[in-house]
């Protein structure tokens, strides 16, 4: 059988009686994304050691309606979470009588580019810290407030608001920070480890089958640069660790806890795979 680069015969995976069909390839669109007059980098030269020559935003793999919705801030439902996050930013909570703004003033200035640099190394906890965990650390240590429960409305909204201040900024983590490189290695191992009853790894869909269709979903590289993301199929915002857990659930494997060592290592590695792509939060996906 002759196999071309673009058109491949359907591939079937059968595990435990479940058949998954990976159908013919379809190239990502050749379009430019501009949000609020800010050009987004949706194609970026991959860093050394990356499996692809080019990092590709998931926006390039979505249907026209989804792409158009993200490009229009007035139409993007995820902007409601950003607006809610702005309210929380200025709301006093906790025994210290402080809000986020009490220490950080105008987020447009103090949080500019911050979302493109996380995860970072937390020397106190001796592990990586992401935006959500940094919010909780500030709430507990500086505000005297309770940490958010995972995926609480306030946590997702405030994370969206903070990351939105980096809209258009290319993702760039510093792997020389603390022990991040070691966690990158752990995350890479997890990314390629097959698990669950379906015996799938992250790489099974987002590397080996990137560009193919599984059911009606055009498989992308699984980039993290748009999270938290508004998803049409859930009708709401989805955090990165929610998405990780959802993918793991779909392989019929036991789900790790959010912000566990496993998922923090995975976040470090997956974020690195999107080096150079613009922060799109809140991205819109199907």
Curated annotation (Swiss-Prot):
**Enzyme class of the recorded protein, top EC level:** transferase
Domain Cytochrome c residue range list: 80-166
Record: residues binding substrate: 243
Tell me, according to the record, the phenotype of the null mutant: Impaired in oxidation of sulfur compounds.
**Which positions are annotated as binding heme 2?**
202, 205-206, 247
InterPro entries referenced in this protein's UniProt entry, alphabetically:
Cyt_c-like_dom, Cyt_c-like_dom_sf, SoxA
State the oligomer form and interacting partners.
Heterodimer of SoxA and SoxX.
Q: Write down what this protein is called.
A: L-cysteine S-thiosulfotransferase subunit SoxA
């Amino acid at each position: 059988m002759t196999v071309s680069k673009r058109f491949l015969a359907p591939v079937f995976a059968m595990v435990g009686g479940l058949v998954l069909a990976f159908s013919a390839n379809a190239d990502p669109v050749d379009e430019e994304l501009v949000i609020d007059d800010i050009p987004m980098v949706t194609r970026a030269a991959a860093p050394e050691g990356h499996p692809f020559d080019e990092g590709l935003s998931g926006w390039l793999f979505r249907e026209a309606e989804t792409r158009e919705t993200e490009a229009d801030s007035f139409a993007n439902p995820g902007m409601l979470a950003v607006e809610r996050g702005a309210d929380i930013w200025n709301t006093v909570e906790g025994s210290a009588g402080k809000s986020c703004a009490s220490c950080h003033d105008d987020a447009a200035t103090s949080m500019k580019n911050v979302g493109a640099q996380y995860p970072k190394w937390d020397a106190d906890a001796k592990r990586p810290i992401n935006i959500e965990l940094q919010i909780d650390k500030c709430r507990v240590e500086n505000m005297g407030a309770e940490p958010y429960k995972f995926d609480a409305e306030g946590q997702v909204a405030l994370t969206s608001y903070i990351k939105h201040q980096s809209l258009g900024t290319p993702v760039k983590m510093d792997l020389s920070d603390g022990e991040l490189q070691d966690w990158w290695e752990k995350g890479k191992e997890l990314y390629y480890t097959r698990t669950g009853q379906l015996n799938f790894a992250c790489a099974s869909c987002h590397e080996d089958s990137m560009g193919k269709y599984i059911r009606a979903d055009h498989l992308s590289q699984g980039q993290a640069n748009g999270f938290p993301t508004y998803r049409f199929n859930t009708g709401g915002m989805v955090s990165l660790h929610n998405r990780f857990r959802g993918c793991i659930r779909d392989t019929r494997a036991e789900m790790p806890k959010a912000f566990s060592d496993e998922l923090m290592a995975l976040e470090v590695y997956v974020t690195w795979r999107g080096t150079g792509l613009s922060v799109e939060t809140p991205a819109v996906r199907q």
